[in-house]
Structure formats: C-alpha cells, structure tokens
Amino acid sequence: MSNNGADLTFGYISCFVAILLFGSNFVPLKKFDTGDGMFLQWVLCAAIWLVALVVNLILHCPKFWPFAMLGGCIWATGNIAVVPIIKTIGLGLGILIWGSFNALTGWASSRFGWFGLDAEEVSNPLLNYIGAGLSVVSAFIFLFIKSEIPNNTCSMDTTPLITEHVINTTQDPCSWVDKLSTVHHRIVGCSLAVISGVLYGSTFVPIIYIKDHSKRNDSIYAGASQYDLDYVFAHFSGIFLTSTVYFLAYCIAMKNSPKLYPEAVLPGFLSGVLWAIATCCWFIANHSLSAVVSFPIITAGPGFIAAMWGIFMFKEIKGLQNYLLMILAFCIILTGALCTAFSKI
C-alpha cells in the first residue's frame, strides 16, 4: 500500500474511533444529577488536560504555540451549554443538532478559506459539496424530532453537597434549566445546540491557521509543525484554562456557594477522558484526510451513536413518526459521509 493509501486508511480508522467515542462520551453522566453543569464542565476539562499532558510527553514535548489555545477557549465556551442541552432536549437530539452545525461551520471555514485559512481543494468538489449540503438537510430534519425528557423533581436526594453545610441559608436545589416550561425547554435546548455547534466548528481554526502560515517565511509561524497532534497540548490547555476562569466566575456569581455534585465527579472524569481520546483521533484524521473531509464525517457520525443510546438505553425518543424521521436523517447522514469520503479519492 502506498503512503497516500496508508494515510487514507489510518485517517478513516481514526474517524471511526472518534465517532464512536464522541457519540458515547456523555453516556456516563446521563444517570447522575449534574445541576447547572458548571462544576461538571471543570471536572471534564481537568480530565481532558491530563490526557493532553500524557500525549505531549509521548510526542516528546513539541513546541508550544499559545495561539493554538484560542481553539480550546472557543470549545470550552460552547461546551458550557452541554448540560442544559442534554436536560432540555436529550442526549441524542442534542448531539445530532450541534453535530450538524459543527460539520457545516468546520467544513465551510476549511473549504472556502474563512478566518485567514488557505482554501482546501479536494479531488471531486461536487461530491464534497453534496456531502456538506446533506449535513445541512439532516440538521433541519433533527429539529422536528421530539424527545421525551423526564421532569426533574428536584428532590433533596440530589441536593448539592456544599449546600448541606450552609447554615441559615435557603437554597433551591433546582437549577434554572429545571424550572423551564416544556415549550421553553425545546426552544432553549435547540438554540443552545445551534450556538454550541457553530463554536465547536470553529475550534480547529487557530491550529489550521498556524499550519497554513508555517509555509510562509514572513510569518511568525514559519517552520511550525504540520502534524496536528503536536498542537493538542496547547489546544487542551486553552480548554482547561477557560473552563477554570468560567468556574471561578461562577463561584463569584454564586457568592462562593457553588452547587457541587460529588457523585458526578468520576463519571465526569471518564467523560472527559473519552472526549480527549476522540479529539486526538480527530487531530490525526485532520492530518491524514484534511479538515474539509474529516469534519462532515466525524461531526455527523456521533449523532447516530448518541441517538441509539437515546432510543434503546434512555428511551428519550419514541413514536413511529420520530423513528421514521430518525431513519431518514441517518440515511441522509450516511450518504453525505460517503460523498465526503469519496471526494478525497
């Protein structure tokens, strides 16, 4: 097998692993109360940073580019909304919506050279356009799928640990998400999923920018590595730094009485590890296939995995109409992913 063929094979294998882990990484958290998600966000990001540290040591500590941290900051900002999204519209539908907008944003920025990037070319542009277009179509179909999320009773069994020791203070164990009406649940959940998807789709822009400008002698990034995984430590450091800043701001806003859920620590850590491994696979896929190919594939696939969890494990999606819409959306996603994959060959 030629080097190019080996790269393609390795890239598609990386895509498969990333899809499987991205679609499953929030499953450990589903059975635990996570409150408003701010504490969980910090735990998850701490686990992500530890994985990055291990990868960085394995790669013998490549040069650290601070600008690559910006992508991590963008991702952490979008990730704040994950818990509210899951609580309002469910795991399956949430990942389906934000994955579709993630795909569109990431693909368009690479294909057309947004944000100062070099526009990427593919062997068959028509197939690539069709693949990206089908991702957009699937996103609109997902918006019509209704998920059934159990109402949170806000029992004292799920009261945050830290509030049990506060004397003469009355705190509502419910988060703001739990107080939303059914109609507002769907509006807020879908809106947050779209915003998170756009932010997620922009997360690799700083790294691709550095790689593109490393080929120019007059750039401050001249000579920078072309291997995407060399930037994982800077990227993940940006994630952890940003999540820490947000968590401290949250503690200040809560007057030093944040809602901490100790039972969510280990599941949150596991979720972070799964996400970090999946993202490392995505970095490898970007290097082997290019972002214009990897984005539509990796961002569309996890929705299928998450929806299977939502249907068979958590019973979030029910009814013949919803099942038919899901099947239609999956067929569109599969067709789009195949078109995108073959556009590289």
UniProtKB/Swiss-Prot annotation:
It comes from the Eukaryota. Pfam families: TMEM144. Keywords: Membrane, Transmembrane, Transmembrane helix. Its main location: membrane. Coiled coil: none annotated. The keyword Secreted does not apply. The chain crosses the membrane at residues 8-28, 39-59, 64-86, 93-115, 125-145, 190-210, 232-252, 264-284, 292-312, 323-343. One of its GO terms (molecular function) is carbohydrate transmembrane transporter activity. This is Transmembrane protein 144.
